[in-house]
Amino acid sequence: MAKLRSATSTEGRNMAGARALWRATGVKDTDFGKPIIAIANSFTQFVPGHVHLKDMGSLVASAIEEAGGIAKEFNTIAVDDGIAMGHGGMLYSLPSRELIADSVEYMVNAHCADALVCISNCDKITPGMLMAALRLNIPVVFVSGGPMEAGKTKLSDKLIKLDLVDAMVAAADDRISDADSEKIERSACPTCGSCSGMFTANSMNCLTEALGLSLPGNGSMLATHADRRELFLEAGRRVMKLAKRYYGDDDASVLPRSIASFKAFENAMALDVAMGGSSNTVLHLLAAAQEAEVDFTMDDIDRISRKVPHLCKVAPSTPKYHMEDVHRAGGVMAILGELDRAGLLHTDVNHVASEDGTLKSVLERFDVVLTKDEKVHEFFRAGPAGIPTTRAFSQSCRWDTLDDDRREGCIRSREFAFSQEGGLAVLSGNLAENGCIVKTAGVDESNLKFSGVARVYESQEDAVAGILGGEVVAGDVVVIRFEGPKGGPGMQEMLYPTSYLKSRGLGTQCALITDGRFSGGTSGLSIGHVSPEAASGGTIGLIENGDRIDIDIPGRSIKLLVSDAELESRRAAMNAKGPLAWKPLSRVRPVSMALKAYAMLATSADKGAVRDVSKLEG
């Protein structure tokens, strides 16, 4: 039988000092010997997806203590990618993922906690906590803050749904009046919660359901809805059940690495492709797999992307549907159910929500197409109130009916899929020998094949200036390089360049290629994660203005139409620059010591932009 980790600091005469300190936190004599459950919260007033999390730790703690555990809460950081976007702050976003993972590990291991509840929500927080959970391998349950309600406003007497990206595009579009731009801005983000489309935050929170580490509804139940309260309480109860099974019954099947197996990662990626999730999820799944010691690679992602259809289309790929609509259609469990009926899902994997241990039983209960449970149907009818608020659980509105239309609804069956090609694709070729990622869900059909002329920039800032200044014209392939994990450093998101291409009427007239990454809010022919990155000697660092680039998404290829001999000549010339080789010589960018430390160990995107541990073992 596994011994409680916390016994290290609570048992024996030599731990008198530690017990004295535990008592000073409120632990009583009768509590010693109970499992200590860490609650990793990420409350902050900087981020709308986290502004309502202050009291969530206490809610989870109450359920833990009622079930016989000791709950101890701590906090970690959370960066708002939207607020950090378009300036030097974005350099810190991806590196914060590693910092979050480390901080959770530090707190849990320093205090010998027995199990963990992760209260996350936005872009790098869920991935960082996921990496920590798989690294620690103790019983864990994830519960997120939930998505924001979609913004809504009237323009030209027509009610439209909005999100953050709409506000950005409108602000840069000279055809939109100041009054309408301000109206969109004021309506785009009406409530607390993660941004309302299938952006990175919501994508990752959905993927925790598919990985088996969070409860049904975690990725789709609105932050404002009263029903979400039960998810926090159940997370506390559930983690205690897992802890008792592991420490009391010696049942290792409840541990994160037993749950998040290779098959579970395949399920998560299948969900991602089916729902057209953020391209950032590829980065984070690769990083999480390495922490879990699961051999899940870009090759696996490519294989899955070729066979899984696009079953759920959500903003930013369409203005019609947001996360509130995904929930009404049955949420993640409904998409997984359709994948199962298509023969594209492993249902024999473990899941924290299962009483018998398998995803199959979870689907039988929570797939709205299968279940007759009226409580489950009522749960998925939870809808928006349309009232601006920063308060969680502030409303109890419900849709009159579920969206169970699998022919023309938000979630489709395989037969009526939005496309038989999935929502993400891996491209490769001489421009990206180790691959790159495109969110095909957001690509216009006319752009699935594209050939254009390179317009090269060595920073996001220069690219923005070039787009807004009229340098970029129809037929160009905008290349933004030296923005990878090492070269940025920090692998900035390129939401502003893609948004400005749209606002200039070039959204379907140009392509954008980068060794950086894209916001989950990006759509259009935007190809990121080019690996190897320029700073690591990637071919993207050798592209010159005027070079022709061919993109073939159906053929999964991306080619720089320059001869091998010419590329060898350019590479030799670059290497001859010595210490200045593979660096953006025209760019002036202050880089802090913290970011330099990150850059020293950062790998390219095809490895998840994780740290190269071989450099630590040297």
From Swiss-Prot:
UniProt: Mg(2+) binding residues: 81, 123-124, 493
GO biological process, alphabetically ordered: isoleucine biosynthetic process; L-valine biosynthetic process
Catalytic site positions: 519
Superkingdom of this protein's organism: Bacteria
Cofactor: how bound: Binds 1 [2Fe-2S] cluster per subunit. This cluster acts as a Lewis acid cofactor.
Cited SUPFAM superfamilies: IlvD/EDD N-terminal domain-like, LeuD/IlvD-like
Cofactor annotation: [2Fe-2S] cluster; Mg(2+)
Enzyme Commission number, as recorded: 4.2.1.9
Catalytic activity: (2R)-2,3-dihydroxy-3-methylbutanoate = 3-methyl-2-oxobutanoate + H2O; (2R,3R)-2,3-dihydroxy-3-methylpentanoate = (S)-3-methyl-2-oxopentanoate + H2O
Biochemical pathway: Amino-acid biosynthesis; L-isoleucine biosynthesis; L-isoleucine from 2-oxobutanoate: step 3/4; Amino-acid biosynthesis; L-valine biosynthesis; L-valine from pyruvate: step 3/4
Modified residues (N6-carboxylysine): 124
Sequence positions that bind [2Fe-2S] cluster: 122, 195
InterPro entries: Dihydro-acid_dehy_C (IPR042096), DihydroxyA_deHydtase (IPR004404), DiOHA_6PGluconate_deHydtase_CS (IPR020558), ILV_EDD_C (IPR056740), ILV_EDD_N (IPR000581), IlvD/EDD_N (IPR037237)
Keywords: 2Fe-2S, Amino-acid biosynthesis, Branched-chain amino acid biosynthesis, Iron, Iron-sulfur, Lyase, Magnesium, Metal-binding
GO cellular component: cytosol
Function: Functions in the biosynthesis of branched-chain amino acids. Catalyzes the dehydration of (2R,3R)-2,3-dihydroxy-3-methylpentanoate (2,3-dihydroxy-3-methylvalerate) into 2-oxo-3-methylpentanoate (2-oxo-3-methylvalerate) and of (2R)-2,3-dihydroxy-3-methylbutanoate (2,3-dihydroxyisovalerate) into 2-oxo-3-methylbutanoate (2-oxoisovalerate), the penultimate precursor to L-isoleucine and L-valine, respectively.
SUBUNIT field: Homodimer.
Protein family according to the UniProt entry: Belongs to the IlvD/Edd family.
Protein name per its UniProtKB record: Dihydroxy-acid dehydratase
